Amino acid sequence: MSSNFDGIKKRKFGIEIEMTGLTRSQAAKAMANVLDGRVEHEGGSYDKYVVTDAKNRKWAVVYDGSINCYNSNGDRASKSYSVEMNSPVLEYEDIPLLQEVVRALRRAGGVTGPRYCAGTHIHISADDYTPQQIRNLVNIFASKEDFLWDALQVSTARESYCRKMDKEFIKEINQKKPTDMETIKRLWYHGRMSEQFQHYSNSRYVICNLHSFFQHGHYEIRAYNGSLHAGEVRSQIVLALAISNAAMTKKYCSPHVSQSDNMRYSFRVWLLNLGLIGDEFKNCRAHLLKHLEGDIAWRHPEDGIVARAKLKEKRELEKQAARERRAEPVSGNSTQAENVPEENNEPLESECEGVEEELEMSM
């Protein structure tokens, strides 16, 4: 991995996954089995359960009032079936452990997703960000949020909890180019500075929430639908880390809104530009691209049709020439060509080099 992308694996994060289908007590016990930990019921207004793992880190299970509660039979259930799993601060190397926790919760009966008004929120540590890097961050989300809305299938059921970036804020932060965090904070709250002390400030319900950054030093990505699929959860985290790394390493990220008539191809090019390259991130790319339409291999799909036809013709001619050299009879099925790439085959990263300028995909 290029040194420009090393930060993807060095940034700390945390994750919240909302779910139902099991009780908070059942969720905590399932997690404890994987974490080799102990469960403590602290109670309180969020009826908190704490699971302490082998590294003495605290995982929490709490109540969340936004979740539509169901039991394991699919029937409406009491609020004891409102479950939000909160991880401790994690590092990239902890992702496999987190995936085991996710699998355990699913096996225990956990269900999640838009039907239950359940989402996943990822927190990225940002106490070392500069004002320019915060500006880069919000510009990335502003420019790519239409892509993200489609790729992540942001549910209309969750729109009140996850909106697109505040256009006025994006306009002002790019006009004023603040050099201190206090100015960014004032722009974020539109001068209503008392909101910074409110836990449930209305400013938090956007795709990239800086309210938590001003309170705790980490920002929150709220666009993800809830998932208990271990591979999807990993892809959500990796995307968040890659965006963070871009905000940290790019000199300037434009707020210009990206558009494309081949969303699947364009989004894949962007993922490669973020550093999600090679077999290590192949499954992540697959999860992030699976809801998008278009030809993944060609910017203009009609070019792909022509290229595949030419390749098929070329290979058939090569086969015909080989038969003639061997003086073999031509079989009746000679019109078929083998190993012609299908439309859905993912091209090599090298085939996408140099296209970001054309697609206005650069940040």
Q: Regions from the language model: what does each represent?
A:
Residues 116-124:
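Short, conserved phosphate-binding/catalytic loop or strand-edge motifs used
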